[in-house]
């Protein structure tokens, strides 16, 4: 039996960004790769290296057909505002859980492995596929356990 698509409409995928930590600006990178970006806002807010490597590519090299980062949430609302402006994200939500029902999948682009299970848990429990960018546990012998996806998730 072939599993069904992970999202309702694979030709129109809505992604959410769930989090940012001070150690990395990957929410800017991921969002810019998917949505394109505002070079002025990006250079004002993201780490200089991000503007440098994004600027090395042509504007028409950004974007993924049928995919868009539509929502962002960050622990610090000011971070969410800056990422949204730099990466052309339409909607800022107040809580990570507010992404549920609004997006088809979430990106968790943080590198604090010890936080990943807690950050991913509400999405897994709701059947929203998370992409956790870094390993789930860098300070343990193995990853922190996540609950199994709900019955019927991804069908």
Per-region residue spans from a language model:
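N-terminal glycine-/serine-/threonine-rich beta1-alpha1-beta2 phosphate-ribose binding loop
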Residues: 2-125
């Amino acid at each position: 039996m072939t599993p069904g698509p992970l999202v309702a409409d694979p030709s129109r995928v809505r992604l959410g960004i769930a989090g940012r930590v001070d150690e990395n600006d990957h929410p800017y990178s991921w969002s810019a790769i998917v949505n394109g970006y505002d070079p002025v806002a990006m250079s004002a807010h993201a780490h200089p290296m991000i503007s440098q490597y994004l600027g090395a590519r042509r504007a028409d090299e950004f974007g993924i057909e049928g995919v868009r980062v539509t929502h962002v949430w960050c622990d610090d609302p000011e971070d969410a505002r800056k990422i949204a402006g730099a990466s052309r994200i339409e909607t800022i939500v107040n809580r990570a859980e507010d992404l549920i029902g609004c997006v088809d999948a979430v990106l968790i682009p943080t590198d604090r492995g010890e936080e990943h299970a807690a950050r991913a848990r509400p999405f897994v429990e709701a059947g929203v596929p998370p992409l956790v960018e870094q390993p789930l546990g860098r300070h343990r012998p193995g990853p922190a356990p996540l609950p199994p996806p709900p019955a019927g998730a991804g069908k």
